[in-house]
């Protein structure tokens, strides 16, 4: 029995040590699993029609790309290919964590990709609509500077 427990303990340590979040920058994924930003197609946010309608496309499990230790889903193979060719052009700021939470020193708050906006040419995700509204009605540049400081502090601790 003690050999079984010891073996399970060693396996658990190996799994935790190999977890994607430990090696790469953190990415906003579901609590269980590695799907980024609620499975939304991060390339689709950049489409003019999506920006106008504010309705982002759901990604599908058949179009996936691994990046930063997370699984990014796409609505089409074309979107997956665009992302694979230039992921930095499509990954939301702070790798999809809530921009408002970072700007208010709340730390890393996961998002599901539903609440979002562009400030300048940058895509920001939010945990909830009040955070987005704060940025729309307030000084988004100042909020971004605060979020940037918090993000850099988090990255330096990793």
Feature map (PLM): residue ranges:
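Bacterial N-terminal signal peptides that target proteins for export
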Residues: 1-9
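Bacterial N-terminal signal peptides
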Residues: 8-18
């Amino acid at each position: 029995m003690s050999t079984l427990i010891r073996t399970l303990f060693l396996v658990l340590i190996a799994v935790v040590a190999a977890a994607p979040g430990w090696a790469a920058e953190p990415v906003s994924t579901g609590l269980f699993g590695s799907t980024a930003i609620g499975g939304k197609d991060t390339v689709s946010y950049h489409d003019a029609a999506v920006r106008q309608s504010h309705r982002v496309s759901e990604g599908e499990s058949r179009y996936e790309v691994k990046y930063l230790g997370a699984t990014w889903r796409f609505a089409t193979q074309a979107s997956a290919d665009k992302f694979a060719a230039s992921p930095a052009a499509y990954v939301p700021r702070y790798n999809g964590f809530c921009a408002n939470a970072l700007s208010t020193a709340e730390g890393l708050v996961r998002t599901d990709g539903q609440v979002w906006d562009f400030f300048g040419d940058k895509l920001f995700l939010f945990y909830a609509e009040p955070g987005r509204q704060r940025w729309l009605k307030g000084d988004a540049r100042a909020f971004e500077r605060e979020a940037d400081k918090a993000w850099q502090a988090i990255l330096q601790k990793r």
